[in-house]
């Protein structure tokens, strides 16, 4: 299982802050594409990704037992 944590607007759009996916291995790009399709998360394309509390680059490999945090850009004034 890979644990996915969603923050801010992404969590609101998905209706949850945490999702577990039953996969042994995936890339961060595959996870983002799957969540975009399943939950309609259009803003996920601009989100930062952290795996096990460390920011990673696009298309990083993720394995079962990892935690992936998807953090959208923050705006305000």
UniProtKB/Swiss-Prot annotation:
One BP term from GO: Mo-molybdopterin cofactor biosynthetic process
Keyword Nucleotide-binding: yes
Source taxon at top rank: Bacteria
GO annotations of cellular component type: molybdopterin adenylyltransferase complex
Role this protein plays: Involved in sulfur transfer in the conversion of molybdopterin precursor Z to molybdopterin.
Record-linked NCBIfam families: moaD
Family stated for the protein in its record: Belongs to the MoaD family.
Protein name: Molybdopterin synthase sulfur carrier subunit
Organism name: Bacillus subtilis (strain 168)
Organism lineage string: Bacteria, Bacillati, Bacillota, Bacilli, Bacillales
């Amino acid at each position: 299982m890979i644990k996915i944590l969603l923050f801010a607007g992404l969590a609101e759009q998905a209706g949850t802050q945490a999702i577990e996916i039953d996969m042994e291995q995936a890339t961060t790009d595959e996870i983002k594409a799957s969540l975009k399709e399943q939950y309609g998360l259009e803003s996920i394309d601009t989100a930062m990704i952290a795996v096990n509390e460390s920011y990673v680059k696009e298309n990083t490999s993720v394995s079962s037992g990892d935690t992936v945090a998807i953090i959208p850009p923050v705006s305000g004034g």
